[in-house]
Amino acid sequence: MLFDKYGRSLQKLRYVVNDECNYNCVFCHFEGQSRRQGRYLTAEDYGFVTSVFKSLGVADFKITGGEPLLRGDIDLIVANIAKTGAYVTLTTNGYLLRKWVRKLQAAGLKRANVSIHTTDPEKYSKITGVPPSAFREVLRGLTEARDVGISLKLNAVVLRGINTDRDSVKNLVKLAASLGAALQFIELMPSGWGASVFNELYEPIETLVNIIFELGGRPAGVRKELHNRPLYNIAGVTVELIKNFSNPTFCSGCTTMRLTSDGKLKTCIYADSSVDLMPYIKSRDVEGLLYAVRTALARREPRFKLYSSS
């Protein structure tokens, strides 16, 4: 296993497999990359990269986008990652989940993280920029994913005045319970489109803690291997709180890097710099790829620190 100069291990890799999306969420951070990247990595490329990162001790690989289910070969991407023995998950808005779910399950997908934010179709439309009817299609996809045995986690970005009241939280917990899903609340990030709405919609994650207790929730530990996320349990539903803004504790527990759709390795979603892995991937140059990964890791800096020399 590799460690950066702050002692943080590299355990997880996020694959940003495309930059197209069929939604227009008001806060989209684009996974820290610019739009319209150019040529994409192939399904076979992802298999190669996964095998190399696994040799470094990385075991957890997450597919994201854009909207990854827009890729016509998404099942092949999952299959090429999974055949290495890696644990593979996928983040999606869920609209196309029903179309793909059986192929994804057969390919080896272990879990789908579905961004849903609210159980109110009108609010859902306001957040995502799609018709309210899309919400029902997402629910159908979630139900089918549950039925074929794919583990589920619901994502909800915390948005002031939209989903920060008691009823909104309660309804999301209820939905998660009906699906046997976990639920995670994510602080709004001042990145991508999120920067333009940050002052209007940002609500500290701590606001939800009081609501969680009101709903009978209890502390259930901390995910030290992933951003030191606090966990709660509400009537059997695991709830994670992701405080990613101005939080050194979050950064100190970060064990993740991300590979953009055009083959650039980013050490932090907030960072502009990256290391280009594409030449080594396309030439199947294992030693070159290992060197490039170590170079990126040596440059890795937490976005938020307890102490700064600047």
UniProtKB/Swiss-Prot annotation:
Specify the superkingdom. Archaea
EC top class, as a word: lyase
Q: Which residues bind [4Fe-4S] cluster 2?
A: C251, C254, C268
Q: Which residues are recorded as binding [4Fe-4S] cluster 1?
A: C21, C25, C28
A GO molecular function held by the record: 4 iron, 4 sulfur cluster binding
Reactions accelerated catalytically:
GTP + AH2 + S-adenosyl-L-methionine = (8S)-3',8-cyclo-7,8-dihydroguanosine 5'-triphosphate + 5'-deoxyadenosine + L-methionine + A + H(+)
Does the record carry Cell membrane as a key word?
Answer: no
Residues at which S-adenosyl-L-methionine binds: G66, S115
EC no. given is 4.1.99.22
Pathway the protein acts in: Cofactor biosynthesis; molybdopterin biosynthesis
Keyword tags: 4Fe-4S, GTP-binding, Iron, Iron-sulfur, Lyase, Metal-binding, Molybdenum cofactor biosynthesis, Nucleotide-binding, S-adenosyl-L-methionine
Q: Which residues form the Radical SAM core domain?
A: 5-218
Q: Which Gene3D superfamilies match?
A: Aldolase class I (3.20.20.70)
Membrane listed as a keyword: no
Q: Which cofactor does it need?
A: [4Fe-4S] cluster
- Report any Pfam family annotated for this entry: Mob_synth_C
Purpose: Catalyzes the cyclization of GTP to (8S)-3',8-cyclo-7,8-dihydroguanosine 5'-triphosphate.
Q: Which family does the entry's similarity section mention?
A: Belongs to the radical SAM superfamily. MoaA family.
HAMAP family the record matches: MoaA_A
- Protein's UniProt name: Probable GTP 3',8-cyclase
The gene name reads moaA
